[in-house]
A protein has these predicted regions:
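Active-site-proximal loop/helix segment associated with metal-binding centers of metalloenzymes
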Residues: 130-193
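Conserved beta-sheet core of the metallophosphoesterase superfamily
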Residues: 108-113, 126, 131, 137-146, ...
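Core catalytic region of metal-dependent phosphoesterases/phosphodiesterases
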Residues: 9-12, 16, 21-120
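Short, solvent-exposed loop/turn segments at secondary-structure junctions
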Residues: 20-21, 57-58, 96, 132-133, ...
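Beta-strand-turn-beta hairpins that frame and shape the catalytic cleft
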Residues: 7-14, 118-126, 223-228
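N-terminal short leaders/motifs
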Residues: 58-82, 180-190, 194-210
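N-terminal amphipathic/basic-hydrophobic helices that include classical n-h-c signal peptides
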Residues: 1-6
Length: 237
């Protein structure tokens, strides 16, 4: 209780994506990290659960004994929320697709590498990051298969972290094929590939909501009868 008031009911589900912590430099990233932590503090009183929809970090790779330097405040706040009993679900994005078992073991947070169905209050949700879904973007899809392959992860581990992280940061900011992102402009409902993906999924099964990130563009679009596609935007633009 606080000042004698009854405890707030935890009835809200929160979604966030594409924080890309780590870029363009530590100082700029720190500003966004502080804002994100403040937001987590605001929602912790009534959060039934929290979904992090990928690209929390602009780069993340787990060696057996090493994880990327930095992000201590963000990770500490996530640990605090988990210790308080709030469920958190993490979907890897195209920038943190090399997430291993660190979040699972350290925070007891399940990590998903593809869209997953959830049911809340009688509503069916399909939730994920959003990269590589729908038609088109074939170059990125081929690249993702290579990067996500266990052999690629094994090979990358042989790079010293100072070299591996610097190389990955360069690719992250310079190569659009790897980032898998278009310019952050609305392409129209017929051209937005996550809208097309949602409509095709509805041909075989009804979903009340599709929740994705990746596009860095907030959207809410009706994709069918009683079915809505929502994009969470980002924490950069």
């Amino acid at each position: 209780m606080r000042n004698g008031s009854p405890m707030t009911k935890k009835t809200k589900i929160y979604f966030a994506s594409d924080q890309h912590f780590g870029i363009p430099d530590p100082e700029s990233s720190r500003v966004r990290e502080v804002k994100f932590i403040s937001w987590l503090d605001e929602i912790k009183e009534d959060a039934e659960c929290i979904f992090l929809l990928g690209d929390l970090f602009d780069f993340w790779f787990e060696y057996k004994k090493v994880v990327p330097r930095g992000f201590v405040r963000v990770l500490g706040k996530i640990a605090e929320l988990r210790d308080s009993g709030i469920p958190i679900y993490f979907f890897v994005g195209n920038h943190d697709l090399w997430m291993g078992d660190y979040f699972q073991k350290e925070f007891d947070i399940p990590v998903f590498d593809r869209p997953k169905e959830f049911d809340f209050n009688g509503k069916r949700f399909l939730i994920g990051h959003g990269d590589g879904l729908g038609p088109g973007d074939k170059g990125y899809k081929r690249m993702k298969k290579v990067f996500a392959h266990p052999f690629s992860k094994w090979l990358y581990r042989w790079l010293h972290p100072d070299i591996g992280v610097r190389f990955a940061q360069y690719l992250s900011t310079k190569n659009k094929l790897i980032s898998g992102q278009e310019d952050v402009i609305f392409l129209g409902e017929d051209q937005e590939w996550l809208v097309q993906y949602a409509r095709r999924k509805l041909e075989s099964k009804h979903y009340d909501y599709f929740l994705f990130g990746h596009r860095h563009l907030p959207m809410e679009i009706e994709v069918g009868e009683n079915s809505t596609y929502i994009n969470t935007g980002d924490w950069i633009t």
